[in-house]
């Protein structure tokens, strides 16, 4: 059950510490998924590792690198000359933020990478990421833009003007 009242704000230092922990957690996920994939696919089944297994590894490394680099640059803290924390960076744990989508991409890639030890066809599940991106683009940008009224806005009637017109009509009768 959620606590009642206003959600407490977090200070710069707390955001800085949480960002460090979040980055450390996702780095462990990246390293773990790569270790499992390399151990199973490229060491145990080395003789059956194809060109596509190596390409999948390179693809996942590129996705991990881009996502992790983006997250770490968002969380970059600023310090003053005397070493005091000036800015804790963007909050990586903020809901509906860009970092949340980057974390989803890292998790999806890790899950697909580990499951692809069984079959390379599992990589087709990675198409969920661009599908989700297209969905968000449609819901937040394109859909409202296409469905917006393109005609001139209807003139708003002022209440005073409307009352005046009603009085004039009553006088005419």
Curated annotation (Swiss-Prot):
Record's compositionally biased regions (Basic residues): 160-173
Annotated keywords: Acetylation, Autophagy, Endoplasmic reticulum, Membrane, Transmembrane, Transmembrane helix
Residue ranges of the TM segments: 25-45, 51-68, 105-129
Claim: Transmembrane helix is one of the keywords in the record: yes
Topology in membrane: Multi-pass membrane protein
Cell compartment(s), UniProt: Endoplasmic reticulum membrane
A UniProt-annotated Pfam family: TMEM208_SND2
GO BP: autophagy; vacuolar protein processing
Keyword Glycoprotein appears in the UniProt entry: no
Residue ranges of the region described as Disordered: 153-173
Modification N-acetylmethionine, positions: 1
Primary location recorded for the protein, binned into one broad class: endoplasmic reticulum
GO cellular component: endoplasmic reticulum membrane; intracellular membrane-bounded organelle; vacuole
Function: May function as a negative regulator of endoplasmic reticulum-stress induced autophagy.
Family named by the database record: Belongs to the TMEM208 family.
Protein's name according to its UniProt entry: Transmembrane protein 208
Source species: Bos taurus
Gene: TMEM208
């Amino acid at each position: 059950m959620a606590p009642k009242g206003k959600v407490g704000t977090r200070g710069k230092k707390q955001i800085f510490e949480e960002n460090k922990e979040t980055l450390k957690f996702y780095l462990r996920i990246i390293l773990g998924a790569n270790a499992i994939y390399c151990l199973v696919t490229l060491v145990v089944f080395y003789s059956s590792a194809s060109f596509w297994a190596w390409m999948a590894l390179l693809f996942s490394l590129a996705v991990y690198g881009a996502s992790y680099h983006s997250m770490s640059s968002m969380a970059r803290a600023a310090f003053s000359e005397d070493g005091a924390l000036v800015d804790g960076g963007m909050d990586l744990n903020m809901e509906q933020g860009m970092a949340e989508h980057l974390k989803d991409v890292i998790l999806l890639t890790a899950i697909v990478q580990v499951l692809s030890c069984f079959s390379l066809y599992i990589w087709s599940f990675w198409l969920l990421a661009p599908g989700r991106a297209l969905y968000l683009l449609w819901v937040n940008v394109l859909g409202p833009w296409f469905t917006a009224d393109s005609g001139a806005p209807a003139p708003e009637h002022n209440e005073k003007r409307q009352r005046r017109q009603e009085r004039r009509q009553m006088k005419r009768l």
